[in-house]
Amino acid sequence: MKTETIDIIIPAHNCADTIGDTIKSLDLQLCKDFKATVVIDGADDKLEAVVEAAADSRPWLRCIKSSENKGAGAARNLGIMASVSEWLMFLDADDLLLPHAIATMQQAIPERPEFVIGKTMRESERGCYEVVGREQLTWLHGRMYNYSFLTAYSITFPNDLRMSEDLAFNMKCAELAKNVPETSWPVHIQRWNGKSLSRRSGASREQARTYIKACLDYAVNCVRAEREPEDLRLLPDALAACYYYLDAVERLFPNDHELYAEMCRDFIKLAQTVELPRLRTLPAWEARLARSLALPSRPYGTAYMPELTFEQRFINATLK
């Protein structure tokens, strides 16, 4: 029998220098009704020593080890299989949860959502923060998932993908979910990690292409399946995600006109497709689509919210 406790699954590989701060952010949670599982992906004596030492003084923390490095998706699948909780969150081993994160997510449990979208504060290379929510529909960061929903539809992370495995997982969730609330405030901090696979320029180029294509495919499949308007609440958010990655392609690869033109053509084709009269019955459809299409270009390294004082204090305190 699964409990209503939230289980936080942390895939870990070559992160002995950062996972201590991640665990420390869990120490500071205002709500203590949670468990955390670190899945060590591949033999790493230094990382194992750090996690095991932390687990000795934290009854809510446990460690699972995989002798072979199979990637973050496979590690998350191990964590899901070992979970005893009805609710799951995924946290990278170099990211942080804000102190109110668990308490905020628990407020959504009585609604029995398929998953909950929590806003994320994304750190730039320059140390500034951008707040991201539903428009990043592809992210795992700051999300909470219902275990029964995942198992009912056999939703797992593709074990054969080393990149964009989170995309495949989230697009399947978005396609099948009907109740997806969003938090009002950020719950998660994505820290800058220049060594991350998705930060390397070659990988970022391919990832941007993969992300946009998957968002477009998801939206097109929704339209072709002639789903009812009430089942298409996330479609404008998929469009917003497309637009976001188009903006990223333009900013990160300003000289790659071919890639940008290809993505723009696909996006415009989809935007024309979803203007079908059938979709106009979706509540506030046109307004939401307009917001998706009118997202401003985001200058790299810009802070977007003046209300970051508390979060900044937390970051400074956590990293001391």
Name each region found by the language model:
Residues L96, H100-Y129:
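Conserved donor NDP-sugar-binding/catalytic core segment of glycosyltransferases
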Residues L88:
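Short aromatic/hydrophobic "clamp" motif used to bind/position activated sugar donors
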Residues P186-N193, R200-L232, Y245, R251-T273:
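Catalytic core of nucleotide-sugar-dependent glycosyltransferases
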Residues K2, A248-K320:
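Membrane-interface aromatic/basic loop that binds lipid-linked glycans or pyrophosphate carriers
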Residues E130-S204:
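Conserved nucleotide-sugar donor-binding catalytic segment
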Residues I40-A49, E68, D92:
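A conserved acidic beta->alpha catalytic loop
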